[in-house]
A protein has these predicted regions:
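Arg/Gly-rich low-complexity intrinsically disordered repeat tracts
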Residues: 4-13
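N-terminal phosphate/diphosphate-binding loop that engages ATP/GTP or pyrophosphate donors
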Residues: 16, 30-97, 101, 106-109
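Hydrophobic anchor at the beta1->P-loop junction of P-loop NTPases
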Residues: 19-20
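Conserved catalytic-core segment of NTP-binding enzymes
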Residues: 25, 34-35, 54, 122-211
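A short acidic, often aromatic-flanked loop/helix-cap motif at beta-alpha or helix-coil junctions
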Residues: 81-82, 209, 214-220
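Switch II (G3) loop of P-loop NTPases
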Residues: 103, 107-130
């Protein structure tokens, strides 16, 4: 079934979302900060949250800046592990368990204080946070509509189908897909990049909300048609 098209970003998206990806490094943080900035420009008190950072803290700093420092950096990112690995692995290396209670308390407080909250997961949908707790479980606890960021490249179809299937298996709503282009302006996209959208629309009953061009620094404020890039 083809995805239903909508005319504006607000009609497509709740202003509070859980953002996941088909993998690590697909552009979740870039998309998250674009959404936070977009909603704030529309007058919403929107802030970003990345509950867990592993390695550097640059992702949290970008969300903090997008939120115009409306909340402390430690609320944007309550748990920071230095090893650049999956949270479960990083916690073992640091010999300190991840403080899930702190994440839950911070999320609950931000959700109550701000009408718009963009939560960015860490890595992909099934990345382990603890031995028996995954990103998917964190999303389920947050209870927000889930949007999947997809790097538009070879392999995207399989990764997207598996991710959407798992989201639904966890009883959550997949609110849509955002295609993030990896080919820079002036480069010739390959056949996968030029066909992934139409194939995903044919195979999934999930809307492709919009596409992000490589290096794009804003989501248009004008009405956004799903038929082309944002």
């Amino acid at each position: 079934m083809r995805a239903t098209q909508h005319s504006t970003l607000n009609s497509q998206l709740s202003s509070s979302l859980f953002l996941t990806g088909t993998d690590t490094g697909v552009g979740k943080t870039h998309v998250a900060q674009l959404l936070v900035r977009r909603f704030r420009r529309e007058g919403l008190d929107c802030v970003g949250m990345k509950p867990i950072c592993c390695g550097g803290r640059e992702d949290a700093e970008l969300l903090h800046a997008a939120s115009e420092a409306a909340i402390p950096l430690n609320d944007v990112n309550p748990v920071w592990l230095r090893p650049p690995a999956a949270p479960y692995t990083a916690a073992i290396i640091e010999n300190r368990p991840i403080d899930l209670a702190l994440i839950r308390e911070t999320f609950t407080r931000l959700r109550a204080a701000h009408p718009s909250l963009i939560v960015e997961g860490v890595g992909g949908w099934r990345v382990p946070i603890a031995r028996d707790f995954f990103v998917s479980d964190l999303a389920a606890e947050c209870g927000l509509p889930v949007v999947v960021v997809v790097a538009n490249r070879l392999g995207a179809i399989n990764h997207t189908l598996l991710t959407v299937e798992s989201i639904r298996a966890h009883g959550l709503v997949c609110a849509g897909i955002i295609l993030n282009h990896t080919t820079a302006a002036g480069e010739i996209p390959d056949i996968a990049e030029t066909t992934n959208r139409s194939v995903l629309e044919d195979l999934l009953d999930v809307p492709i909300l919009f596409e992000i061009a490589h290096g794009q620094m804003a989501v248009a404020l004008s009405p956004l048609e799903c038929g082309g890039r944002a």
